[in-house]
Curated annotation (Swiss-Prot):
<feature type="transmembrane region" description="Helical">
    <location>
        <begin position="10"/>
        <end position="30"/>
    </location>
</feature>
<dbReference type="InterPro" id="IPR050425">
    <property type="entry name" value="NAD(P)_dehydrat-like"/>
</dbReference>
<comment type="pathway">
    <text>Secondary metabolite biosynthesis; terpenoid biosynthesis.</text>
</comment>
<keyword id="KW-0560">Oxidoreductase</keyword>
<keyword id="KW-0472">Membrane</keyword>
<comment type="similarity">
    <text>Belongs to the NAD(P)-dependent epimerase/dehydratase family. Dihydroflavonol-4-reductase subfamily.</text>
</comment>
<keyword id="KW-1133">Transmembrane helix</keyword>
<dbReference type="InterPro" id="IPR036291">
    <property type="entry name" value="NAD(P)-bd_dom_sf"/>
</dbReference>
<dbReference type="GO" id="GO:0016020">
    <property type="term" value="C:membrane"/>
</dbReference>
<dbReference type="InterPro" id="IPR001509">
    <property type="entry name" value="Epimerase_deHydtase"/>
</dbReference>
<protein>
    <recommendedName>
        <fullName>NAD-dependent epimerase/dehydratase tndE</fullName>
        <ecNumber>1.1.1.-</ecNumber>
    </recommendedName>
</protein>
<feature type="binding site">
    <location>
        <position position="176"/>
    </location>
    <ligand>
        <name>NADP(+)</name>
    </ligand>
</feature>
<dbReference type="GO" id="GO:0016616">
    <property type="term" value="F:oxidoreductase activity, acting on the CH-OH group of donors, NAD or NADP as acceptor"/>
</dbReference>
<keyword id="KW-0521">NADP</keyword>
<keyword id="KW-0812">Transmembrane</keyword>
<dbReference type="Pfam" id="PF01370">
    <property type="entry name" value="Epimerase"/>
</dbReference>
<comment type="function">
    <text>NAD-dependent epimerase/dehydratase; part of the gene cluster that mediates the biosynthesis of talaronoid C, a fusicoccane diterpenoid with an unprecedented tricyclic 5/8/6 ring system. The first step in the pathway is performed by the fusicoccadiene synthase tndC that possesses both prenyl transferase and terpene cyclase activity, converting isopentenyl diphosphate and dimethylallyl diphosphate into geranylgeranyl diphosphate (GGDP) and further converting GGDP into talarodiene, a precursor for talaronoid C.</text>
</comment>
Length: 363
């Protein structure tokens, strides 16, 4: 690690800390001696995420704060006092196809957080969880081997997301892509125009896999993998997935960590994209994890198709270098190991029934 702008003992605020990525970021910070304050929307979420964090780090400094609506004016003002860094991870993942119910409040909530941060001199870093969909529109044909870089932007999802009703189910994917694109656009416009005293960074992850840390955690995209491993007939949800890349949740968290504390990482878009996504890859990895079971092969069983992958090439040299500085000798975690952790290291009490779309999702 290069020199840090926030040394151990510093306080980091994480929004939506009960979410899959956010909880792993909290664990990485606490493991390194940082204090973490995280927002949740309900007292129940505050209870179980505190249990999950403290079970792993009994002496860690962690506090969950109930904030039902992040878009309320001034709601973050008191929360950011004495905070050294902010990780804005919370996002609506409800798959609601109405852009006014997803994008509008999402942008307002981010704006509220940025404005509150400017009023607190202690804030040194602000990191936004974006998405690969802010860099590339997965529904638009692209030239073979098109290069995706930190300067790539999705310029086509937003018109489709805001087209007039009716809002059918497939519109939800355009709305999500547009939410991430518009959020990051707002984020960097704020940096350019407001010129805050703190440094801003964003992280653009792909399909995130890794261990689900509590039975009540919905698990985001990792839930689809764990459910598929538990029951080979439970793969229908993959039909919704258009992610070209997979990334381990710990690698994703570490890139956020670097954006929060690494002096060398300033005003950057970090691509958290490890390996091409391919549905058939999961069944082949499952065979290695548990060869005693019968797994789907190609198109032959349970509707599993050996499809996916990507026609894009992602320039992740910068992200790999950062991960190596943080002790990840290979850079991104290999696909086999990431899937193994998802399947075997998740809370054994977790079931796919916990993964249900909700309007208050903070994944």
């Amino acid at each position: 690690m290069q020199s840090t702008v926030v040394p151990p003992g510093g306080l980091v605020l994480i929004t939506g800390v009960n979410g899959f990525l956010a909880s792993h970021l909290a664990l990485q910070l606490i493991q390194r001696g940082y204090m973490v304050k995280g927002t949740v929307r309900t007292a129940e979420s505050a209870s179980w995420i505190t249990e999950a964090i403290m079970r792993r780090h009994p002496t860690g400094k962690f506090q969950a704060v109930v904030i039902p609506i992040l878009s309320a004016s001034g709601v973050m003002d008191d929360l950011v006092k004495d905070v050294d860094g902010i990780a804005y991870v919370a996002a609506d993942t409800s798959l609601n196809p109405d852009p006014d119910q997803v994008i509008t409040p999402g942008l307002e909530a981010l704006k509220v957080a940025l404005q509150s941060a400017t009023q607190t001199q202690s804030v040194k870093r602000f990191v936004l969880t974006s998405s690969y969909t802010a860099a590339v529109d997965t529904f638009v044909p692209s030239a073979p081997d098109a290069l995706i870089t930190r300067d790539s932007w999705n310029q086509t999802s937003t018109p489709r997301a805001w087209a007039p009703p009716p809002y059918d189910a497939l519109r939800a994917l355009d709305v999500y892509q547009s939410l991430k694109t518009e959020s990051e656009t707002l984020f960097w416009k704020f940096a350019s125009e407001a010129k805050p005293s703190f440094i801003q960074n964003s992280v653009l992850p792909g399909f995130v896999v890794g261990p689900i840390i509590h039975r009540k955690q919905r698990g985001s995209t990792a839930a689809l993998v764990k459910a598929y491993f538990d029951d080979v007939t439970c793969n229908q949800a993959f039909a919704w997935i258009s992610a070209p890349w997979v990334v381990d949740v710990v690698d994703n968290a570490l890139l956020h960590l670097a954006g929060l504390i690494d002096e060398d990482v300033q005003n950057e878009r970090l691509l958290a994209l490890a390996e091409p996504f391919k549905l058939g890859n999961f069944a082949r990895v499952f065979e290695q994890i548990d060869p005693s079971r019968s797994w789907p092969a190609g198109d032959n069983k349970h509707g599993v198709k050996d499809e996916g992958g990507t026609k894009w090439v992602a320039d992740t040299k910068r992200s790999v270098a950062i991960l190596q500085r943080l002790g990840q000798d290979e850079g991104f975690t290999p696909f086999l190991e990431s899937v193994r952790r998802t399947c075997l290291d998740s809370d054994p009490a977790w079931t796919f029934g916990n993964f249900l779309p909700k309007s208050d999702s903070q994944e």
